[in-house]
A protein has these predicted regions:
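Extracellular carbohydrate-recognition regions
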Residues: 499-520
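Extracytoplasmic soluble-region selector
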Residues: 406-501
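Extracellular glycoside hydrolase catalytic/binding regions
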Residues: 27-30, 54, 58-76, 163-189, ...
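Bacterial N-terminal signal peptides
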Residues: 8-16
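N-terminal carbohydrate-binding accessory modules
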Residues: 21-96, 107-119
Length: 686
C-alpha cells in the first residue's frame, strides 16, 4: 500500500508572494534563488502581466501616431498603461516591452520582416533607447510594474553560434548592459531574444530539441550572458528556448551558468499538446487532447527546466476565433477537461514557479470594464471562454483581491466528467490529473487549496505525484483520495485499469497528423491524407518486458497502411515501420527495431504508436497488444504451459484483466470469449 500526504497542487496564489504594488508604493527587489524568483525576504514571487510594443503598426495599426514622433508615441503608450492599470484596474505586476525595430532600422531600407537585421542602425538604437524605451520603462515602474525588455525584432529561422544574428544580439545587449539607467534599476529585467526556431547543433546540423542543438543553444546564450555580466549588469535575465520558445528540456541538462537566470516561455493553443480551435501558425495543433495531452507536453518540456529555475511566460493569449482579437484561437474550457486556458492555469499553478501574461493587445485590456455578459450576448471582453474575462479575475486572485464567494468545491479527475467515477480506464504511460475545483459563478474554474491524502494499492501500476496519477505499468490498482476543504471531509475510491491501447474516444487519436476520423462503436478509423492515427504516451510507454507488439485489422487494405513506433516524443523524427501489405496483422519485433541509419529503438520509452496511411479509406481496428509469442497469433489455439508459469491476461481490446497470475489459474472465472493469455489467443468455452 502506497500512502502519500501532501497539499493539493500548491496553488501559486496561496504559497507565493505576489509582489503586487500600486502607483507610489515601494516595489520589492527581486532575485533568483534556486528554482524561485524571490523578494528580499525570501518570499516566492510569480509575476503576471501583459505586453506593449512601440511602433505605429502595433499601436492600433498606425491610427494613433507615425513618422517617428517620439512625443506622440510616449503620450499614446503612457495613456494605454493608465487605462490598463488605473481605469480598467488590472492587477498586473509586470510588462514585457518590445524595443521594436521600427526605431532602430534605417528609414526607407527594405527588409523581409522582423527577422531581417540588415537595416539595423546602432546609432538609432542608442538614440531611441534613451528617448523611447527607457522613459517607457520608468513610467511602467511608476505604475507598479516590473519591466521585461526584449531586443528589436525576432530570430531568423536558423541561428548559429558565431553567426551574424549572434553578433547582433551581443552588440545590442552589450550596449544595454552599460546603461546605468537600466542596470542600476532593480525593477528592470531582460529577455535575451524572441522565438529562436532552429539552431546549428554541435554536430553541424540545424534543428531543435536534439542533444547537439540543446548544447549549442546554451552556448549561444551563455556567451550573451557573459558579455552582459562583464559589463556589470546583474539584472535578472530571461533566456528563451528553441522551437519558437517551446522547448526547454535541454536546459535541465545544459543550464545557463550564473546568478539571476530564468527562462522565458511562449505558450499558445496547440503547443505542448494543448487544445487549439485553429492551429497555430508556428507549431500547428489540434483540438481534443484536453488536459492529459497538454499535461504530458508540459511535463516533457517545461517541468524539467522549472525544476532548476523560474519560468516566465512572455507570450500567450486565447479567444474564440469569432472575435479575431487574439493570436491564439481556443477557449478557456474546463480544468482537467477540454480547452486551453483553464488547463494552462492549473498546470502553471501546479508547477509553482511559473509567471505568465496575456499578449492580447493592451489597448483591449485598457477597454475592459468588468461588466459580465450573458449567454448569446458575450463580447470578447466578458466571454468566459476568452482570456480577458478569466485572466482579469485570475490576476485579481493572485494579487489577493476579493472575488465572488465560492459556490461549490469538488474533486475532479481527467478526463473530466460530472463526478469522479468508481471505475476508470487509464492509458499506460499516460497521466490522470486530480484537482479540487471551485465555482465562483463567473463562468470559469478556479483551482483551490485543500489537504489531499492518497492511498494506492499497487504503486507499480499507479503512482501519485503532485496532483497527477501516473500509469506506470499494465494492470489494475485501487486509489483512494481523501480531501478536506473548509472543514468538509470527503473520500472517494477509484478502481483503475491501466492498458496501453484503449480503442476508445479520448485515447485513440485519429488526427495526430492530418484530420482523420474514428468511430468508437465500430472500431473504424481513417487517417487524413498521409495522416497518422494512434496513441501518444507523454511519460513514455515501457514495453521492454515484451518481445512483440501486434496490431490487427478486420480486413486486408490497399491504402499503404503501416504500423509505426516512435521512441522520441516528436512525430517528425524517424520511426520504426511495419507494413501491413495484404495482411490483417502487423507484428513488430520490439527487440530488433532498427532504423535506416542503424540506430536501434528503445522499447523502454515509446512515445507515439499508431497507423499511417495515404488517407481516404476506413480500417476496422480489432486490437493492439504486446505479447511474448509471435506465432501464437496465427489463430485461436489451446495453450499447454506448465503450472508454475506466470502470465498476463488481456481482452481483445487490449485491456489487461489479470497480471502475473499462474498459468493454470489464468482462465478461472472468465466469461466465454476470446482472450490473450501469455501472449496466445485463447477461446474460453464454459
Amino acid at each position: 500500500m502506497n500512502r502519500i500526504k501532501l497539499l493539493a497542487f500548491l496553488v501559486a496564489l496561496l504559497t507565493t508572494g505576489m509582489a503586487y504594488a500600486w502607483p507610489g508604493m515601494p516595489m520589492p527587489k527581486l532575485h533568483v534563488e534556486g528554482r524561485w524568483l524571490v523578494d528580499e525576504d525570501g518570499n516566492h514571487v510569480n509575476l503576471h502581466g501583459f505586453g506593449q510594443t512601440y511602433s505605429p503598426w502595433f499601436n492600433e495599426m498606425g491610427s494613433k501616431w507615425n513618422n517617428y514622433n517620439v512625443q506622440e508615441c510616449l503620450k499614446y503608450n503612457k495613456d494605454i498603461l493608465d487605462g490598463v492599470m488605473d481605469r480598467a484596474g488590472w492587477k498586473a505586476t509586470y510588462i514585457r516591452m518590445h524595443m521594436d525595430p521600427y526605431w532602430s532600422n534605417t528609414p526607407g531600407v527594405w527588409t523581409s520582416g522582423e527577422n531581417d537585421i540588415s537595416a539595423f542602425d546602432m546609432r538609432r538604437f542608442q538614440k531611441y533607447l534613451k528617448e523611447v524605451f527607457i522613459p517607457m520603462a520608468e513610467y511602467a515602474i511608476s505604475k507598479g510594474l516590473y519591466v521585461v525588455m526584449r531586443p528589436p525584432g525576432v530570430c531568423p529561422e536558423k541561428i548559429a553560434v558565431g553567426d551574424d544574428y549572434h553578433a547582433y544580439l551581443k552588440r545590442v545587449w552589450g550596449y544595454v548592459a552599460q546603461q546605468k539607467a537600466l542596470t542600476e534599476n532593480p525593477y528592470v529585467m531582460f529577455e535575451l531574444a524572441n522565438e529562436p526556431v532552429q539552431i546549428k547543433g554541435t554536430d553541424g546540423n540545424y534543428g531543435s530539441g536534439t542533444d547537439a542543438c540543446n548544447k549549442a543553444l546554451t552556448q549561444f546564450f551563455q556567451e550573451i550572458v557573459d558579455i552582459m555580466r562583464q559589463c556589470g549588469c546583474e539584472n535578472i535575465l530571461w533566456v528563451p528556448g528553441s522551437g519558437y520558445q517551446s522547448q526547454y528540456a535541454g536546459f535541465a541538462k545544459y543550464p545557463i551558468r550564473g546568478k539571476n537566470i530564468g527562462y522565458a516561455v511562449h505558450v499558445y493553443p496547440g503547443w505542448y499538446g494543448s487544445d487549439a480551435i485553429e492551429p497555430s501558425h508556428e507549431l500547428g495543433g489540434s483540438y481534443g487532447g484536453g488536459y492529459s495531452s497538454f499535461a504530458s507536453g508540459w511535463a516533457n518540456q517545461i517541468e524539467p527546466c522549472a525544476a532548476i529555475a523560474p519560468m516566465l511566460v512572455t507570450e500567450m493569449d486565447w479567444l474564440p476565433k469569432k472575435y479575431e482579437s487574439s493570436w491564439g484561437k481556443s477557449i478557456t474550457g474546463k480544468m482537467l477537461g477540454a480547452g486551453f486556458g483553464a488547463n494552462f492555469k492549473l498546470l502553471a499553478d501546479r508547477t509553482g514557479n511559473v509567471g505568465w501574461m496575456l499578449f492580447t493587445g493592451p489597448e483591449l485590456l485598457a477597454q475592459f470594464d468588468g461588466q459580465p455578459g450573458s449567454e448569446g450576448n458575450y463580447t470578447k471582453f466578458n466571454d468566459p471562454e476568452g482570456c480577458m474575462w478569466s485572466g482579469y479575475h485570475w490576476f485579481a486572485e493572485y494579487a489577493g483581491f476579493e472575488l465572488p464567494e465560492i459556490q461549490s468545491v469538488d474533486l475532479y479527475l481527467s478526463p473530466r466528467s460530472e463526478s469522479v467515477p468508481s471505475e476508470c480506464l487509464i492509458q499506460t504511460g499516460s497521466i490522470t490529473g486530480a484537482a479540487l475545483i471551485a465555482d465562483r459563478g463567473l463562468g470559469f474554474d478556479f483551482n483551490v487549496q485543500g489537504d489531499i491524502d492518497v492511498e494506492i494499492s499497487n504503486p507499480e501500476i499507479l503512482e501519485w505525484d503532485n496532483g497527477v496519477l501516473n500509469a506506470r505499468g499494465i494492470g489494475e490498482a485501487d486509489c483512494t483520495i481523501s480531501y478536506n476543504v473548509n472543514g468538509k471531509e470527503e473520500s472517494k475510491t477509484i478502481h483503475f485499469t491501466s492498458t496501453p491501447f484503449p480503442i476508445k474516444n479520448g485515447y485513440f487519436n485519429p488526427s495526430i497528423w492530418a484530420d482523420g476520423s474514428f468511430d468508437e462503436a465500430t472500431g473504424e478509423f481513417s487517417t487524413g491524407q498521409w495522416g497518422f492515427a494512434g496513441w501518444k504516451f507523454g511519460s513514455g510507454l515501457d514495453l521492454s518486458d515484451y518481445n512483440y507488439l501486434i496490431a490487427e485489422i478486420e480486413a486486408p487494405q490497399t491504402n499503404g497502411l503501416s504500423f509505426r513506433v516512435f521512441d522520441v516524443d516528436n512525430y517528425w523524427t524517424d520511426c520504426y515501420i511495419e507494413e501491413f501489405d495484404k495482411s490483417t496483422r502487423a507484428v513488430i519485433d520490439l527487440k530488433n527495431m532498427k532504423l535506416k541509419d542503424g540506430r536501434k529503438l528503445d522499447p523502454s520509452h515509446l512515445y507515439i504508436i499508431g497507423f499511417w496511411s495515404h488517407g481516404g479509406q476506413k480500417f476496422k481496428l480489432k486490437s493492439v497488444f504486446p505479447a511474448n509469442d509471435r506465432n501464437a497469433e496465427a489463430g485461436v489455439e489451446d495453450i499447454y504451459i506448465t503450472d508454475d508459469n506466470v502470465v498476463d491476461v488481456y481482452n481483445m481490446q487490449g485491456v489487461c484483466l489479470r497480471r502475473g497470475v499462474a498459468a493454470d489459474e489464468a482462465a478461472y472465472g472468465l466469461p466465454n470469449g476470446l482472450y490473450i493469455i501469455g501472449g496466445k489467443k485463447v477461446m474460453i468455452k464454459n
